Regions:
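Core catalytic region of metal-dependent phosphoesterases/phosphodiesterases
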Residues: 1-95
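Conserved catalytic scaffold of divalent metal-dependent phosphoesterases
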Residues: 67-176
Length: 176
């Protein structure tokens, strides 16, 4: 977080970005919350949130155990930090706040949305493997994700028709 991520934050601020997205695996392995690396990461995310809204996507569970990212919205900052820990959509609103969909997607484009993000955090392949077998898990995940993504077509089309950009975010492994 000190050098690489810090440089990225410096560049985002210097270039005047409107928002920042971190698509998972903020660290290369799981860290204890009291570790110095988590403190550095938190300071950099806070510095970024002082500049623009921040969206963080849940990464690989071995790097970011579930719940790890929950501390980041609590850091404060001029702008909010939203953590997408589940499949769903979130809109960046005109006032710079985040508005998450109540379900897995929006039913209508939120009034005042600047952009709509479809968030696909990491999929627990072990759970899928337990249901379909290890040999078939990767293909099963692919089929389910394809079906899921097609379910977003309607709302994304409505957003584009309203000239609201749509952005797909994912964290995972591509097979095939």
């Amino acid at each position: 977080a000190g050098r690489c991520f810090g440089y990225g934050v410096d560049q985002a601020i210097e270039r005047g970005v409107d928002l920042a997205v971190i698509t998972g695996d903020s660290t290369d392995h799981a860290l204890d919350v009291h570790s110095p690396a988590v403190g550095r990461l938190a300071r950099e995310v806070r510095r970024l949130a002082d500049h623009c809204p921040v969206l963080m996507l849940q990464g690989t569970f071995s790097h970011e155990p579930p719940g790890t990212l929950a501390i980041f919205p609590l850091l404060g900052g001029r702008h909010p930090v939203h953590v997408a820990g589940r499949i769903g959509q979130v809109a960046l609103m005109a006032d710079g706040t985040w508005a998450p969909a109540q379900g897995w997607r929006f039913d209508a484009v939120p009034a005042g949305a600047r952009a709509v993000f479809t968030c696909i955090p990491t999929v627990n392949k072990a759970t899928v493997a337990a249901m379909v077998g290890a040999a078939d898990a990767a293909e099963a995940v692919g089929r389910e994700l394809a079906a899921l993504l097609s379910g977003y077509a309607g709302i994304n089309g409505a957003a584009r028709a309203a000239q609201v950009p749509t952005i797909g975010l994912g964290h995972g492994t591509v097979t095939g």
